[in-house]
Regions:
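Alpha-helical elements of Rossmann-like donor-binding domains used by nucleotide-donor carbohydrate transfer enzymes
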Residues: 9, 13, 44-48, 160
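Catalytic donor-sugar/metal-binding loop of nucleotide-sugar-dependent glycosyltransferases
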Residues: 123-125, 131-142, 149-153, 158-177
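A structural signal for short, well-ordered beta-strand segments and their strand-loop junctions
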Residues: 29-30, 61-64, 169-171
Length: 179
């Protein structure tokens, strides 16, 4: 079993349980419990972030920006930053060319791990992200991700889940520690 598969099973079970209990909309907060998500954020700051998210009529999802750099390239999709499946591209090239594995990892992964100072806006629009925790506005039409058993190591379950939402943002000032 892969970590991705375990995460997808947990997310799907949670959605199955609470989906019928949602009336208009609810806040859904999935999180990776194997990360220290609150090292840089106290409870008051997190509560304020949730309140700001609820009040933001344009947003359907908020995600943190990890420190010292954004690490979750696997779940990230943003034009000009990560346009496709960087991990899969790196893996395919490393299988063809044994020498130079670090170069492929650098090109497809490490060079995409930006620091928050690269961005001006407080809310960075993305097609998909995660980074250990997310805030979502959901209603009872929410669907869960069907894991493709053939691609379970190279497809982030967050990307398929995030396709249900139009306005997703990485919050520049919501910091978590990169693993």
């Amino acid at each position: 079993d892969s970590r991705i598969e375990r995460i997808a099973v947990c997310r799907n079970k949670g959605i199955e349980i609470f989906k019928d209990k949602i009336k208009e909309f609810s806040i859904y907060i999935p999180m990776d419990l194997d990360l220290n998500l609150f090292k840089f954020v106290d409870i008051e700051t997190f509560e304020s972030l949730i309140d700001s998210f609820i009040d933001d009529n344009n947003a359907q999802g908020y995600f943190p920006f990890s420190f010292p750099y954004y690490y979750d390239i696997f779940a990230l999709r943003k034009k000009g930053w990560v346009d496709g499946n960087a991990l899969l591209n790196s893996f395919k090239l490393k299988r063809k060319f044994i020498i130079g594995a670090f170069i492929f990892n650098y090109i497809y992964i490490f060079s995409k791990q930006f620091k928050k100072e690269k961005f001006i806006e407080d809310l960075i629009p993305v097609e998909s992200a995660f980074g250990g925790i997310g805030l979502y506005k959901v209603n009872n039409s929410i669907k869960y991700y069907e894991l493709d058993k053939n691609d379970k190591y190279f497809i982030s379950e967050h990307i398929s889940f995030n396709e249900q939402f139009n306005y997703l943002f990485i919050c520049r000032d919501w910091a978590i520690e990169a693993p």
